[in-house]
Amino acid sequence: MTDLYAEALATFAALYAEAQNSAEPEASAMTVATANVDGRPSARTVLLKAFDARGFVFYTHLDSAKGRDLQTHPQAALLFLWRSLREAGIQVRIEGGVQLVSADESDAYFASRPRMSQIGAWASRQSQTLGSREEFDAAIAKVEATFEGREVPRPDGWGGFRVVPQAFEFWYGAKFRLHERWRYEADAASHWSKRMLYP
């Protein structure tokens, strides 16, 4: 891990801790932007579940729209927006390649989830058409009956993605739009640079 990458990761960690201890209602919420095989972009909000020097992890159904995007076009952009921090909020952007986390990691995280969340992962066919809420409720009841009295295993089609950073951008909001921006970026040889940007 290069010094500048370590610096960017430490900066994120400090800001994330600050957001967790602030009035932010959901500090771990992040927008994940992907593109499908035709290059059509889409974005949605998910929760950050882990991060370290290897990257930033979230979990989902692998056959969901984002899951399919990331398996056919393994690049993503993340966006954290913490409006309550500092003078006028802080925004962090992270861009990078994407890889599946190991089955062991996915198993461990799935086992830590509330039981009803585990059941929901089995009952939901994420991103597919649903005829009615009653249909979903019936699917939930069926899964509950299937696993009654025993642990709920992780579905084969559910797992984690790790975004491996190739760029970080830190935006510190200020009055009169006189913001401060810093960008850390890796080149093709994985050499990191740091520069300040006009707001």
UniProtKB/Swiss-Prot annotation:
SUPFAM superfamilies assigned: FMN-binding split barrel
Keywords on record: Flavoprotein, FMN, Oxidoreductase, Pyridoxine biosynthesis
Cofactor note: Binds 1 FMN per subunit.
InterPro entries on file: Pyridox_Oxase, Pyridox_Oxase_CS, Pyridox_Oxase_N, Pyridoxamine_oxidase_dimer_C, Split_barrel_FMN-bd
Gene Ontology biological process terms in this record: pyridoxine biosynthetic process
Quaternary structure (record): Homodimer.
Official protein name in the record: Pyridoxine/pyridoxamine 5'-phosphate oxidase
Reported cofactor(s): FMN
Any matching Pfam family: PNP_phzG_C
Binding site for FMN: R44, T45, V46, L47, L48, K49, Y59, T60, K66, Q91, Q126, S127, W171, R181
Binding-site residues for substrate, renumbered to this chain: K49, Y109, R113, S117, R177, L178, H179
Pathway per the UniProt entry: Cofactor metabolism; pyridoxal 5'-phosphate salvage; pyridoxal 5'-phosphate from pyridoxamine 5'-phosphate: step 1/1; Cofactor metabolism; pyridoxal 5'-phosphate salvage; pyridoxal 5'-phosphate from pyridoxine 5'-phosphate: step 1/1
Enzyme Commission code: 1.4.3.5
Purpose of the protein: Catalyzes the oxidation of either pyridoxine 5'-phosphate (PNP) or pyridoxamine 5'-phosphate (PMP) into pyridoxal 5'-phosphate (PLP).
SS bonds (residue pairs): none
Gene: pdxH
PANTHER family per UniProt: PYRIDOXINE-5'-PHOSPHATE OXIDASE, PYRIDOXINE-5-PHOSPHATE OXIDASE
GO MF annotation list: FMN binding; pyridoxamine phosphate oxidase activity
Catalytic activity: pyridoxamine 5'-phosphate + O2 + H2O = pyridoxal 5'-phosphate + H2O2 + NH4(+); pyridoxine 5'-phosphate + O2 = pyridoxal 5'-phosphate + H2O2
Organism: Xanthomonas euvesicatoria pv. vesicatoria (strain 85-10)
Entry-linked NCBIfam families: pdxH (TIGR00558), PRK05679.1 (NF004231)
Family: Belongs to the pyridoxamine 5'-phosphate oxidase family.
